[in-house]
């Protein structure tokens, strides 16, 4: 079982040497040459510096296509027409599974076709120099966004290629994404990624790391998401990471989302060591979207309003075409502009929402209880503790496909649309907190004239895509049972 100890320089070099032959572009990686390339970049392309010095939330979309020139064109469009402050490069699914041969076939097919045969940018196949061409061609900093349980070679190639931010982590890119990777193995893989980022940082090239906050993206209780962020942050900090962006995915209730983002920042600064700079990122709604673009814009606007009130350091935007899959560049840019409009109109207003302090206090209590259980499960070692906590169910993620998590915890919304826990299973929360959740869900059940049941859970999963927040019986979102004018 891995422990939360820093990899030695010899261990880092040995693993890197073993990885070089996994695909031929791995042999292009030269650390000293990479340092020199990063040092040649202007301040405007240094991700951590741009993010950490901003005085309002920065916007970043998701975007990735197979071919280099098309990826450059896409990101330039989002930069120039969408006003993106930070840019992404989303990696394809074959690369996420380390299937570089299949990625190569898809890249070759895409080059000879008007169709994209991959759902992202195969950075390992492109290699170091193509990555540098991408970085040189753009004005804004660029982040690697992927979903890869074993991202070691991807990190080697992209960091050498000039990327200065790398998303993911051993829990957030395992539990929500895959069945076939055990948590101990992904922790070991990500210790290498984080140590590599730390090695760059120690040479004056700060690599920003961003754990994936939304997890499964489906009604994740805030305290569970924040606990995972803190664990991944601690693991990264041990390996020398000094710029950490902790993530959170919108659940849809404005008060709860603002409270959660404030709790995330506060607890991040509390649990992570002093030399770490903590920033936060807010992901606009990651669940199902309405098929109608006008309604989808309403969902995006709620995300923008939430960001204006909570003021995270970064917002990952969505488009009105989420329902149909990968959006057009025009729709992606429009999502950026919609979010920016909401933020710019609201950010200077003094908006006082009742209930935020109480909700934040509850989230913090829950998160501390989960963190205490993790430390106890590992006798103070966070790596061992999180493995044991997931194994026992003391920590869990709803709707997770991974065999490393029990997936027994179930959420549902209360009468205000805040995400509560309907089924706790073995989650390590005290009885008085469980009673609060049960009481809030009981109020909703009374309003709706039905018993608390799994039907509530299922109704809530589909509610926003159906044009509501709460999955009321019969599709009626009015607590009083009146007719809805939404259809």
Curated annotation (Swiss-Prot):
Enzyme category, top tier: isomerase
Source domain of life: Archaea
Transmembrane segments: none
GO molecular function, one term: cobalamin binding
Family: Belongs to the methylaspartate mutase GlmE subunit family.
One Pfam short name: Met_asp_mut_E
Gene behind the chain: glmE
UniProt entry tagged with the keyword Isomerase: yes
UniProt protein name: Glutamate mutase epsilon subunit
Catalytic activity: (2S,3S)-3-methyl-L-aspartate = L-glutamate
Subunit composition and interactions: Heterotetramer composed of 2 epsilon subunits (GlmE) and 2 sigma subunits (GlmS). GlmE exists as a homodimer and GlmS as a monomer.
Described purpose of this protein according to its UniProt entry: Catalyzes the carbon skeleton rearrangement of L-glutamate to L-threo-3-methylaspartate ((2S,3S)-3-methylaspartate).
EC number(s) given by UniProt: 5.4.99.1
Residues where adenosylcob(III)alamin binds: 64, 119, 176, 289, 318, 322
Residue sites binding L-glutamate per the record: 62, 96, 145-146, 167, 173, 177
GO biological process, one term: anaerobic glutamate catabolic process
UniProt pathway: Amino-acid degradation; L-glutamate degradation via mesaconate pathway; acetate and pyruvate from L-glutamate: step 1/4
Keywords linked to the UniProt accession: Cobalamin, Cobalt, Isomerase
């Amino acid at each position: 079982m891995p422990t939360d100890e820093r990899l030695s320089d010899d261990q880092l070099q040995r693993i890197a040497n073993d990885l070089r032959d996994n695909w031929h572009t791995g042999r292009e990686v030269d650390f000293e040459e990479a340092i020199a390339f990063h040092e040649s970049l202007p301040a405007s392309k240094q991700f951590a510096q741009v993010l950490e010095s901003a005085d309002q939330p920065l916007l970043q979309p998701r975007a990735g296509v197979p071919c280099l020139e098309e990826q450059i064109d896409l990101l330039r469009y989002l930069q120039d027409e969408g006003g993106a402050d930070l840019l992404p490069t989303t990696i394809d699914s074959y690369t996420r599974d380390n299937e570089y041969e299949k990625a190569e076939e898809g890249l070759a097919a895409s080059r000879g076709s008007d169709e994209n045969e991959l759902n992202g940018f195969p950075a390992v196949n492109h290699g170091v120099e193509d990555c540098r061409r991408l970085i040189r061609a753009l004005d804004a900093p660029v982040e690697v966004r992927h979903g890869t349980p074993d991202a070691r070679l991807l990190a080697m190639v992209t960091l050498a290629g000039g990327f200065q931010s790398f998303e993911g982590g051993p829990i957030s890119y395992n539990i929500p994404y895959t069945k076939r990777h055990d948590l101990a193995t992904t922790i070991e893989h990500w210790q290498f990624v984080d140590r590599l980022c730390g090695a760059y940082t120690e040479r004056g090239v700060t690599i920003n790391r961003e754990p994936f906050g939304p997890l499964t993206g489906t009604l994740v209780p805030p305290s569970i998401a924040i606990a995972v962020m803190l664990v991944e942050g601690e693991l990264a900090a041990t390996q020398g990471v000094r710029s950490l962006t902790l993530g959170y995915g919108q659940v849809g209730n404005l008060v709860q989302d603002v409270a959660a983002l404030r709790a995330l920042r506060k607890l991040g600064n509390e649990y992570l060591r002093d030399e770490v700079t903590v920033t936060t990122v807010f992901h606009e709604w990651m669940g199902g979207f309405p098929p109608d673009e006008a309604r989808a814009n309403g969902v995006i606007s709620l995300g923008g309003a939430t960001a204006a009130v909570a003021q995270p350091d970064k917002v990952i935007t969505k488009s009105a075409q989420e329902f149909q899959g990968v959006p057009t560049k025009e729709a992606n840019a429009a999502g950026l502009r919609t979010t920016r409009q909401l933020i710019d109109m609201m950010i200077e207003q003094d908006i006082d929402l009742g209930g935020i302090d109480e909700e934040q206090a509850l989230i913090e209590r829950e998160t501390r209880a989960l963190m205490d259980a993790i430390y106890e499960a590992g006798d103070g070692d966070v790596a061992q503790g999180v493995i044991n906590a997931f194994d026992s169910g003391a920590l869990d993620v709803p709707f997770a496909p991974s065999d490393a998590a029990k997936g027994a915890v179930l959420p549902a919304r209360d009468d205000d649309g805040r995400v509560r826990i309907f089924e706790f299973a073995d989650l390590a929360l005290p009885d008085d907190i469980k009673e609060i959740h049960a009481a809030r869900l009981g109020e909703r059940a009374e309003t709706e004239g039905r018993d608390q049941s799994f039907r509530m859970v299922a109704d809530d999963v589909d509610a926003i895509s159906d044009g509501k927040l709460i999955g009321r019986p019969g599709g009626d979102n009015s607590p009083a049972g009146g007719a809805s004018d939404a259809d």
